[in-house]
Amino acid sequence: MDLIQQLEQEEIARLAKNIPDFAPGDTVVVNVNVVEGTRKRAQAYEGVVISRRNRGLNSNFIVRKISSGEGVERTFQLYSPLIASIEVKRRGDVRRAKLYYLRERSGKSARIKEKLPQRRVAAKQAAE
């Protein structure tokens, strides 16, 4: 590990952000700190994660939502101080790492199936 990677790892450890495990296809709520004049408040942004880029301190993800019938995408830096919290609403069942094809789709064709817990694991836990 070179010096830059080591410094990035130390910075990530120092930030100690509580980031949940999420993947493309998941519906998330990102609370962003917004400064308006002298006031600071948290603004919620809910949508589907269409991309995730894991690059250490430079990791980011793109969230897409439909606002007033128009598709809106926003890129968030994972370790940004502007992000107050990330909450996973539902898990999506997708087979791609980048869901850019959702940009051309609208309505029912843009929906993503929900990933349900595995039956075998649930049955095994119920038997115990």
Swiss-Prot record:
One of its GO terms (cellular component) is cytosolic large ribosomal subunit. SUPFAM superfamilies: Translation proteins SH3-like domain (SSF50104). InterPro entries: Ribosomal_bL19, Ribosomal_bL19_CS, Ribosomal_bL19_sf, Translation_prot_SH3-like_sf. GO terms for biological process: translation. The keyword ATP-binding does not apply. Keywords: Ribonucleoprotein, Ribosomal protein. One of its GO terms (molecular function) is structural constituent of ribosome. Coiled coil: none annotated. Pfam families: Ribosomal_L19. This protein is located at the 30S-50S ribosomal subunit interface and may play a role in the structure and function of the aminoacyl-tRNA binding site. Belongs to the bacterial ribosomal protein bL19 family. This is Large ribosomal subunit protein bL19.
